[in-house]
């Protein structure tokens, strides 16, 4: 009788983590940034039917990178949890922190179970507050851990490089156009450092806007509105460059 092949628990968990990370890395990256009036979600997504970003509840948004069918199941479960809790208790009792805890338990259970493969997903759960200080952003990797993020966060294939780029350039109090411009610039950078152009029709953009009078703060930005914001960001860049040139000319005089 042959001896069963033995794999240490540490090696088994390391293999599962590597499997999940490789699956997530095959997906396109996305970024979530705070700006003066809320939180913006930006990602490259050529599909108009399959969304990376979704509304979960009044002030809560959801973003995901990885396998679509897996994070879509999680999204649907999150919507059901939020609806049931809001109906049973109060709408204010539905929070991003509570939802992140539910997702963490689900992902952690699946990751540690030898009976099924780990989910190849990385999630972001965000809640817009009454003020920027009240905004909450949580990142949930494949293993179910929870990371409390501030300012900006990137997930997906090139997340580490994009996060470094954002950390160096993101500022508090940015306008939506400025935040959108920074997000697109970060997503346009390839792994070798070169830049490429992402057309507006390949961008998926959504916001949690605290200034909206409606109870539901989630809104998708598409079509002409997205084009206007991108043009405004480009115009502000050109204006800054022109001002810098004028200052240089004055100095030479």
Swiss-Prot record:
Comp. bias regions, Acidic residues: 243-253
Disulphide linkage map: none
Regulation of activity: The formation of the proteasomal ATPase ARC-20S proteasome complex, likely via the docking of the C-termini of ARC into the intersubunit pockets in the alpha-rings, may trigger opening of the gate for substrate entry. Interconversion between the open-gate and close-gate conformations leads to a dynamic regulation of the 20S proteasome proteolysis activity.
Presence of the UniProt keyword Transport in the record: no
Highest taxon above the source species: Bacteria
Main location: cytoplasm
Cellular component GO terms held in the UniProt record: cytoplasm; proteasome core complex, alpha-subunit complex
InterPro entries: Ntn_hydrolases_N (IPR029055), Proteasome_alpha (IPR050115), Proteasome_alpha-type (IPR023332), Proteasome_asu_bac (IPR022296), Proteasome_sua/b (IPR001353)
UniProt region (Disordered), positions on chain: 232-253
GO terms under biological process: modification-dependent protein catabolic process; proteasomal protein catabolic process
PROSITE patterns: PROTEASOME_ALPHA_2
Location in the cell: Cytoplasm
Pathways per UniProt: Protein degradation; proteasomal Pup-dependent pathway
GO function terms (MF aspect): threonine-type endopeptidase activity
Keywords noted in UniProt: Cytoplasm, Proteasome
Residue ranges with Low complexity bias: 232-242
Binding partners and assembly: The 20S proteasome core is composed of 14 alpha and 14 beta subunits that assemble into four stacked heptameric rings, resulting in a barrel-shaped structure. The two inner rings, each composed of seven catalytic beta subunits, are sandwiched by two outer rings, each composed of seven alpha subunits. The catalytic chamber with the active sites is on the inside of the barrel. Has a gated structure, the ends of the cylinder being occluded by the N-termini of the alpha-subunits. Is capped by the proteasome-associated ATPase, ARC.
Its job: Component of the proteasome core, a large protease complex with broad specificity involved in protein degradation.
Protein family according to the UniProt entry: Belongs to the peptidase T1A family.
Protein name as catalogued: Proteasome subunit alpha
């Amino acid at each position: 009788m042959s001896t069963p092949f033995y794999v240490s628990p540490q090696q088994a968990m390391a293999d599962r983590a590597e499997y999940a990370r490789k699956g997530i890395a095959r997906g396109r990256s996305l970024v979530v940034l705070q700006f003066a009036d809320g939180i913006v979600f930006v990602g490259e997504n050529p599909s108009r039917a399959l969304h990376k970003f979704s509304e979960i509840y009044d002030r809560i948004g959801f973003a995901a990178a990885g396998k679509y069918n897996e994070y879509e199941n999680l999204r649907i479960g999150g919507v059901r949890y939020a609806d049931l809790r809001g109906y049973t208790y109060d709408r204010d009792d539905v929070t991003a922190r509570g939802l992140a805890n539910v997702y963490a338990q689900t992902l952690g259970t699946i990751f540690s179970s030898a009976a099924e493969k780990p989910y190849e997903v990385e999630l972001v759960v965000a809640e817009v507050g009454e003020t920027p200080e009240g905004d909450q952003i949580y990142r949930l990797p494949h293993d179910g851990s929870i990371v409390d993020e501030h300012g900006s966060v990137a997930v997906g294939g090139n997340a580490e490089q994009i996060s470094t780029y954002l950390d160096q350039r993101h500022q508090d109090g940015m306008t939506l156009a400025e935040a959108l411009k920074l997000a697109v610039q970060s997503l346009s950078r390839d792994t070798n450092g070169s830049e490429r152009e992402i057309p507006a029709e390949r961008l998926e953009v959504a916001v949690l806007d605290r200034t909206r009078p409606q109870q539901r703060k989630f809104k998708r930005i598409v079509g002409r509105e997205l084009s206007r914001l991108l043009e405004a960001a480009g115009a502000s860049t050109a204006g800054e460059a022109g001002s810098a040139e004028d200052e240089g000319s004055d100095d030479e005089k």
